[in-house]
Amino acid sequence: GYQRGRYGAEDLRALDGWAAALGIELIPCIQTLGHLERFLHWESSAPLRDTPDVLLAGDEETYRLIEAMLRRCRACYRTKKIHLGMDEAMNLGLGGYLKKNGYHESFDIMLRHVERVGALARKHGFEPMMWSDMYFRCASPNDDYYEDDIEIPQTVIDAAPADMTLVYWDYYHDDEAFYDRYIRLHQKFAAPLRFAGGMWTWLGPAVDYDVFFKKAEPALRACLGNGVTDVMITTWGDDGGETSPQAMLLGLQAW
């Protein structure tokens, strides 16, 4: 944001070193498809733009950009893990891609993109993971992630690569049965599963702990009940990142 700093390569290497000294594995989380509106709104990025926030999949310039991201991450982090994002890429293939290539099913575009980006990540020594929602949205008539009666077609399950960990993110439900059902849906895929909850740090200067605990407790019970031991907590900084990291300590302990 405005007048906010950013970490350079030396800063990231220093953070990685301090984390390692404390027994913490620092893992980069980047975006390689959607959520790139702040980058894509510049005119210089126009050749890489499908829609205002989604990269132009299938274009070689896009993959040169992504490989540059991966090279930078490889130079700054000692971990083998990387999170490639790829969530909420709605309207994929309906902007610049449509003009350039004609109409293609968004799911087919995504599958080719996932395969290409995953190969690039592995080329640079990473074990990749991605958010899972786009696989669910393709099975939804409303392009939604969360639906009570959704069933994932076997063709979708079979098409997802087995060597790309799927991260089921859910910050919103307070019903253990819902988490239980969605974990079981994710477990139909061959890929390893990780769960990501949310600490509700994105509403202002304070963590909404009332909401957080109502969501976290049933989510973690469902994870334990279904053998999901790889879990993470997100602390997004939407709308200015006003929440102090010190205010998050209770949530980190609870998780």
Predicted region positions:
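Glycine-rich, aromatic-flanked loop segments that form ligand/cofactor-binding clefts
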Residues: 18-43, 78-83
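Short, solvent-exposed turn/loop segments enriched in Gly/Ser/Thr/Pro and often Arg
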Residues: 30-36, 85-89, 134, 235-238
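Active-site/ligand-binding-proximal alpha/beta "capping" segment
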Residues: 75-82, 86, 93
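Substrate-binding groove of N-acetylhexosamine-processing glycoside hydrolases
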Residues: 14-17, 23, 63-75, 79-80, ...
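Glycine-rich tight-turn/loop motif centered on a GG-T
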Residues: 2-11, 46-60, 96-108, 164-167
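Short, solvent-exposed loop/turn and secondary-structure capping segments
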Residues: 37-41, 95, 141, 178-179
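Aromatic-lined carbohydrate-binding/catalytic grooves of carbohydrate-active enzymes
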Residues: 1-11, 34-37, 41-47, 194-196, ...
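Catalytic core of soluble alpha/beta enzymes
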Residues: 32, 36-60, 90, 150
